[in-house]
Amino acid sequence: MATSGDTGVDVLVQPFREALNVLGFEVYPLKIGWYNAVVSQAHQLQYSADTLALVVLSTPSMFEKVFLPFLQKNCCQGVRDPIDQCVAQSINSCVSECLHDQNVEISFDYEMLPSRKPKFLAQSAAHVAGAAYYYRPSDVQDPPWGNKKMFGVCIHPRLGGWFAIRALLVLKGVEVGEALQQVPPPNCVSSREARIELLERFNLRWKEWTYRDIIPVEERYSLNKKSISLHLQTSGGSC
């Protein structure tokens, strides 16, 4: 069983990260123990606490760099969700190229277990990896919505809500030591008022996409991306 410090993590992960960065993705390392510490027992992953994992996000540039060419090649005929297929092909290709000597288990955000639970909780994984802050109703004192069911949402420090959490990769047998330290995600929606606004936009007005701009952002989806994503949502796909 391999044991890797921070330098070893960089050596192992950097080629994979660079290959996906070119395609409009971001990659963040984490330990399985960080993830298991914040989810219920039913959602915990059955690996040792020091096992290395990677969470993969897509940025707005992925749409132009990867997805539009994917559509133009007519790769999605008969496919229920072409974005999911495009993302899966991109990640699998980079794993084959850069992590071919590792035993990698890939879980995509849309995959479910036989119990109908998701294979992993995407927003929790992104939060503990330091990629994006997961804002939940419990983060608001005396919420104005009372007992109404409200869902949480992740906000990226540069992209706001203009990104998606796509996959969790577990590198089986690769354990990282204390050199890999957990860094909390930037708390970019810090006030109670802003958090209320964020959660209300996300839960009550999600079709407007305004929650994505709760902070100033560096990139946004193009109009074509929004049109295609809304079409996919109405037909059962995802963005």
Model regions: which residues?
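Auxiliary alpha/beta "docking" domains used to position bulky ligands
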Residues: 1-239
